[in-house]
């Protein structure tokens, strides 16, 4: 897998560069993760669980979460990596749902999601040669 082209592709496709990556990383980690948890867990899981079956709410919100994220990475990797990513993100969605089912709020999964984004953004800092 060629990681060297990812930074260039991010710059060309999304305007993300070493000059603005710190701000992008902070936004992704704090704001975007909250918005995602609000939608995928607060709406698509907790609210949906009240009007449908528990199993449907688990699967629907987890798969929706995975498709949203995998869609952002389409074109960066081959199909095998894409499929593994889709599976891993679905499992992550199920885990986030489980965390929120216990607390009946989105704050637990938001915290975990934030730390996952910190880890992913660390890779971004490396790819952009910032650390």
Model-derived features: where do they sit?
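Juxtamembrane helix-loop-helix connectors linking adjacent transmembrane helices
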Residues: 1-33, 50, 130-131
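Transmembrane helix-loop junctions in multipass membrane proteins, especially transporters and channels
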Residues: 2-6, 70-77, 81, 125-130
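Short juxtamembrane and helix-loop transition motifs at transmembrane-helix boundaries
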Residues: 15-24, 44, 69-77
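Residue-level hotspots within the lipid-embedded alpha helices of multi-pass solute transporters
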Residues: 29-34, 66, 85-89
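Active-site His/Glu-centered metal-binding helix of metallohydrolases
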Residues: 34-39, 43-44, 67, 71, ...
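Membrane-interface helix/loop boundary segments of multi-pass membrane proteins
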Residues: 35-60, 101-105
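Small-polar-interrupted transmembrane alpha-helices in polytopic inner-membrane proteins
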Residues: 57-70
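Functionally important transmembrane alpha-helices
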Residues: 59, 79-131
